[in-house]
Amino acid sequence: EAAALVHDIGIHVSEKKYGSSQGRYQEIEGPSEARSLLARIPGFSSEEVDRICFLVGHHHTYSDIQGMDYQILVEADFLVNIYEDRLSSDAVRHVREKIFRTRTGRELLDAMYGSNPWEMACPDDCCHGGC
């Protein structure tokens, strides 16, 4: 759960340092930011901090996903990023086939995006316009 909360912690540093929040920069800058934050919060063992920092440093790396925590974090991040990045239907199908491994992740992906991610119900006063 802690990894889910801090996984994007490197975005602001990446934007300042590289002028970009691309995943590879988040993976570079995020772990030290996460470690610094977690050091100020009691209750985490050194092993937990190491694992959280590993996840923060790899959450945009989709090959060799090891551990259910890693898999769930990647899938949850994709569920949001598909919408934010307006991935095409083909891209969503590819991600489902190649990345999503958990039954719950696939069920959520299908429920949220179906066969066409842009046919989602959207209120008339949608803040994004043109949904």
Language-model segments: residues:
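Divalent metal-dependent phosphate-bond-processing catalytic cores, especially two-metal-ion Mg2+/Mn2+ enzymes
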Residues: 6, 59-131
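His-Asp-centered metal-binding catalytic motifs of divalent-metal-dependent phosphohydrolases/nucleases
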Residues: 1-19, 30, 53-60, 77
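Acidic/histidine metal-binding catalytic segments
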Residues: 2, 41-56, 69
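An active-site-proximal "capping" alpha-helix that borders the catalytic cofactor pocket
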Residues: 24-41
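Generic helix-packing signal
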Residues: 7-8, 34, 38, 80
